[in-house]
Design a protein with these regions (language model features):
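Bacterial N-terminal signal peptides
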Residues: 7-16
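Sec/Tat signal peptide C-region and signal peptidase I cleavage site
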Residues: 18-22
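Active-site-proximal alpha-helix that buttresses catalytic centers in soluble enzyme cores
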Residues: 24-119, 123-127, 133-135, 169-198, ...
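A short, acidic, amphipathic alpha-helical segment used as a generic capping/interface helix at domain edges
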Residues: 136-147
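Positively charged n-region of N-terminal signal peptides that target proteins for export
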Residues: 1-4
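Histidine-centered catalytic micro-motifs
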Residues: 43-48, 155-162
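Glycine-rich phosphate-binding loop signature in dinucleotide/nucleotide-binding domains
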Residues: 87-89, 146-150
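Generic beta-sheet signal
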Residues: 38-40, 148-157
Length: 207
């Protein structure tokens, strides 16, 4: 088991550089870079109702049996989307989990139609360990895929997927928190910053 964990850690490091838990980031500078496109933003879905649970996790279409965005979570996601548009952050493709809280976050933040996929959908204990590993690998590949010129890719997923893909540094990732990756031509990506929802909103308000 220890050997397996070591191999997995090496594999993650091989995909990503500078992926640290407490990256200090100049938000204004990062926004200017995002305005040029070329980044992948991996976001945990927005704030949810804490008195709800996914009671039918095998059927993501069954929205009534899911933990959904709270009213405040929905409002914050909408404000983040407005901030992105005010800041001039161009969004190309938006990939989301099939669960409604991720789909809704993607639409509100990205402002475009979303592509829901099993690749970034939380599997938890209802899919096999092999399938969870496949989804982690798929998320890493998406984060390391350069977007179309002049655009940024948004991926809205879940805490377990993010931890599985990028490591334990993301154990405390909050709802609505985003990690910005810079893909390169070699098929790898560098984590260049982690931002809370409030960071986008405050930066936009200061303009």
């Amino acid at each position: 088991m220890n050997r397996f964990v070591g191999v997995l850690a090496v594999a993650i490091v091989g995909w990503f550089a500078n992926a640290t838990c407490a990256q200090s980031v100049d938000v204004a500078t990062l926004v200017e870079q995002l305005r040029q496109g070329g980044y992948v933003i991996v976001m945990r879905h927005g704030g949810t109702n804490r008195d709800q649970a996914d009671t039918d996790p095998l059927n993501p279409e069954n929205v009534a049996k899911q933990r959904l965005l709270s009213e405040s979570g929905r409002a914050v996601a909408r404000d983040v989307g407005s901030a992105w548009r005010k800041l001039g952050i161009p969004v190309g493709v938006v990939y989301t989990s099939r669960f409604n809280r991720a789909v809704e976050t993607g639409r509100l933040v990205g402002g475009v139609d979303v592509k829901s996929t099993d690749d970034v959908t939380e599997g938890g204990l209802v899919v096999t360990p092999i399938e969870n590993d496949r989804r982690a690998e798929a998320l890493r590949k998406l984060a390391a895929t350069p977007p179309p010129a002049g655009k940024n890719t948004l991926i809205v997923t879940h805490k377990p997927n993010i931890i599985d893909a990028f490591g334990r540094d993301w154990f405390e990732i909050k709802e609505g928190e985003a990690t910005v990756f810079k893909p390169d031509a070699a098929g790898k990506a560098t984590s260049v910053g982690r931002l809370q929802a409030a960071d986008w909103i405050k930066t936009s308000a200061a303009r």
